[in-house]
Amino acid sequence: GKWMIAAGMAIFGDNNPFGWRFSAALIGTLSVALVAYAAWLLFRSMTVATIAAILASVDGLMFVESRLALLDIFQMFWILATFVCLLLDRQQSRRVLARKVVALAQQNGGTLPQLVFGPGSGWHLWRLAAGVCAGAAVGVKWNSLFFIAAFGLLTVFWDVNARRILGLKNWAVVGALREGLPAFVQMIGVGLIVYLSTWAGWFKSSNAFYRHWAQDNPGQGVQWLPTD
């Protein structure tokens, strides 16, 4: 979030009010588009998407946050982006899984064979993108973790439910194992890497805020444990 604010200041000057407001205004505008796109992916209705965009654009809190150099609008943007990526992943993975099930049925004379595990849903590239956005959201504010945890459970539920709809055997247990572990790596693993990368400037700097706090406040007994 602070990097995004700094980008506007770098372009228009750090003493220019427009510079430190620019990124928030841009991200707030893009957030309206994400709300509309999420509504369209959920309901496949341009009317619903338009109503969602209008409601988002006239929301008082969202309007105010888009005018200020605060972190909330950037957190909302990355959380929305995570959700949209997961919606796209649901769409793509279900399409891939359905194609594989149809192919198996055709090979078996039109009847789906009773496989123990069933086919996988392929590479979840959109879920990887969701992991990137999730890491960025946590990099803005730690309380984004609550949203990410809910999204992680939601994406696994979608995958498991897709297997149930297609009539695959042992859809609950197999789906949770086959989709849950990759989802954890893609959401949490990738997100953790992205989150740590947001601290790159702090690690590279020698005079960053609290950069040498651990050295100046060594622990007692267990040396890595601070005194207070």
Please state what every model-predicted region is.
Residues A52-S57, V64, V84, A134, ...:
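Short helix- or helix-capping micro-motifs
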Residues G1-F18, S23-L26:
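Short hydrophobic/aromatic helix or loop-helix immediately within or flanking a transmembrane segment
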Residues F43, T82-R127, T155-L166:
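Membrane-interface transmembrane helices that cradle and orient dolichyl/undecaprenyl
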Residues F22-F43, A81:
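Transmembrane-helix motifs of polytopic, lipid-linked glycan transferases
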Residues L166-G189:
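Membrane-interfacial entry segments at the cytosolic side of transmembrane helices
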Residues W20-I27, A52, L71, P182-Q186:
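Alpha-helical transmembrane segments of multi-pass integral membrane proteins
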Residues A172, I193-D228:
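Aromatic-rich transmembrane-lumenal/periplasmic boundary elements in polytopic membrane proteins
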Residues W20, A24, R67-F74, V140-N143:
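Short acidic/glycine- and proline-prone juxtamembrane loop motifs at membrane-interface regions
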